[in-house]
Amino acid sequence: MKNDKSYPFPTYSGLLNSEHYDKIGPALWLFLWFISSTTKEIEKDGVSWGIVLGHKPLKAREMAAVFGVSEKTVRRWLELLENHDYIKAVRAPYGLMISVKHSKKFSFRSDNTVHGSLKERPFSPQTPDTNDRTDIDKTNKYTAADDAVDHIAKRFTQLRSAQEGRTVYPSSRDYQAIARIVAIGVPVTQTIKWLEECFQAFENRRTAASETIKAFRYCSKFIEDRFFAQQAKKNAAIQHERMKKHDKTNNRTDFGRAEKRETSITGGQTGRIRRKQV
């Protein structure tokens, strides 16, 4: 299945070695998808667990569609991942709630920052405090990203449920589309504002109750178009201000030169000046 909305996510290269491939083989693809779909991390009994898509129950059919394989293949991959302790799958009425064991998705950059700091900086009593502060800031940053996805998903659920007249929940693709919006830097409050505008615009156009917004991806383009237009407008305004300052500087320079020419006692002549005949 083609995915037009691709986005980067952090993982460790150690996962891509023969030890892991010997254990789980092609199931590694499903495991990587779980990592990319992790929306938050929790710690339980000293173990970090990555919560996949906010613990939305996933059906084998949904996961099979991601890779274009059969449901039987997905079930075999899930069994391998569970047996080798890569994931924990909890059966729910409408699918499986997946957790990634020893999740490091959101600590990836923090770890690199700390190791780099220890290598590059000389020891001083203040260094640990500075690094601790950096770790806290980084953790807060990724926690904020998780919360952003959850807030947007919650509002999308409310809007869709109101439109459908029944309770509906975001799909895995919805969560991925939301994560992309967060990743490109759209503020949560602005995302929710545009999301509401998107639903309102749809309501104004629809002619039948059966016409509803089925996926967040429909709203993604609406949000992205406005965000990029807003960014372009800001950049144009900044460029305009720079040009104005540049023009003012040039005008001041030219004015100064003109003043010098006007106050010359020789009228601009140089060399020997002949006396006027009377």
Swiss-Prot record:
Protein's UniProt keywords contain DNA-binding: yes
UniProt-recorded Gene Ontology molecular function terms: DNA binding
Ranges annotated as DNA-binding: 58-80
InterPro entries named in the record: WH_DNA-bd_sf
Disordered: region residues: 117-136, 239-278
Designated name of the protein: Phage-like element PBSX protein XkdB
Basic and acidic residues biased stretches: 248-263
Keywords of the record: DNA-binding
Family as reported in the entry's similarity comment: To B.subtilis YqaL.
Tagged with keyword DNA-binding: yes
